[in-house]
Swiss-Prot record:
Superkingdom classification of source: Bacteria
Organism the protein comes from: Chlamydia muridarum (strain MoPn / Nigg)
Family membership: Belongs to the UPF0235 family.
GO CC terms, sorted: cytoplasm
Alphabetical list of SUPFAM superfamilies matching this protein: YggU-like (SSF69786)
Protein name as annotated: UPF0235 protein TC_0667
Gene3D superfamilies noted in UniProt: YggU-like
Length: 100
């Protein structure tokens, strides 16, 4: 078990009009990125978007599953978990996200 980290599930829409974090529903973060899913461009855009949205360095966002899928899992510092859920107050508690 990795102390200090947690796993967040993400659903990605590629080739969108803008890069945007859309919602957090049932522990799954929905994001849109402008990049196409070619040669890792969309994955890089997702990492950059999450880092900017959460105000953390890109190297603190690690893609651990779903490299070629719309559904991805990223490893994030546990310290930002509460911040993420504060951005979407209508969602369930921070414990809805998966722990690592």
């Amino acid at each position: 078990m990795l102390e200090g980290f947690w796993v967040l599930e993400i659903r990605v829409t590629t080739k969108a009009r803008e890069n945007k974090v859309v919602s957090l529903e049932d522990g799954i973060l929905r994001v849109r990125v402008t990049e196409a899913p070619e040669r890792g461009k969309a994955n890089d855009a997702v990492v950059a978007l999450l880092a900017k949205f959460l105000s953390i360095p890109k190297n603190d966002v690690t893609l651990i599953a779903g490299e070629a899928s719309r559904r991805k899992k990223v490893l994030l510092p546990r310290a930002i978990k509460a911040f993420l859920f504060e951005q979407f107050p209508q969602t369930s508690s921070p414990d809805a996200g998966k722990k690592c």
